[in-house]
């Protein structure tokens, strides 16, 4: 059966002949096959250092309408199925049980602190029927984020004119400025 692994456990069946007037005696047995599963995970890294990042939130969505065996839509396309948050190792795994023969996609819904959310990076995959000896399909994707940065421009202007040109013999060159943090700055790495 598509979407299930083959059960390789031997089953014993007993059929005996008693005599020609007796109906064949038999015992029934049940054989269960396991439905194939998807192992889905994300990895979060800094775009420059490639160090793992914690605190990134990723949502797994249905990539198409998901139908039951009767053909009825049970989950509409674009529905959020589960959101996970990356740990200190930069990894997160989904626990939702995904139906086979459907498409899915993952998108960042919140960037880690001090990082810019990458809304354009979307990981799409199709969970299709596997060979009957394969119990699980693995899907993993690495997302990267840029740090939030700032640029500071300082201009020296004449006090009286408000222009970047000195008056008379005055000079605007050679000024020394200091930039100080109000709070301690901790590097994310």
Residue ranges, per PLM feature:
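Solvent-exposed loop/turn and edge beta-strand elements of beta-rich ligand-binding domains
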Residues: 1-189
């Amino acid at each position: 059966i598509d979407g299930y692994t083959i059960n390789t456990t031997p089953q014993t069946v007993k059929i005996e002949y008693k005599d020609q007037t007796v109906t064949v005696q038999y015992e029934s047995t049940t054989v269960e096959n396991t439905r194939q599963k998807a192992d889905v995970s994300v990895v979060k890294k800094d775009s420059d250092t490639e160090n793992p990042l914690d605190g990134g939130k990723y949502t797994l969505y249905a990539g198409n309408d998901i139908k039951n065996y009767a053909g009825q839509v049970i989950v509409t396309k674009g529905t959020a199925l589960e959101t996970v948050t990356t740990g200190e190792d930069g990894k997160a795994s989904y626990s939702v049980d995904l139906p086979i023969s459907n498409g899915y996609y993952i998108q960042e819904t919140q960037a880690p602190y001090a990082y810019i959310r990458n809304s354009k990076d979307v990981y799409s995959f199709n969970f299709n029927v596997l060979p009957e000896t394969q119990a699980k399909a693995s899907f993993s994707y690495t997302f990267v984020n840029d740090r939030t940065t700032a640029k500071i421009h300082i201009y020296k202007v004449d006090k009286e004119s408000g222009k970047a040109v000195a008056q008379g013999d005055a000079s605007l060159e050679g000024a020394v400025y200091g930039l100080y943090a109000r709070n301690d700055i901790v590097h994310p790495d």
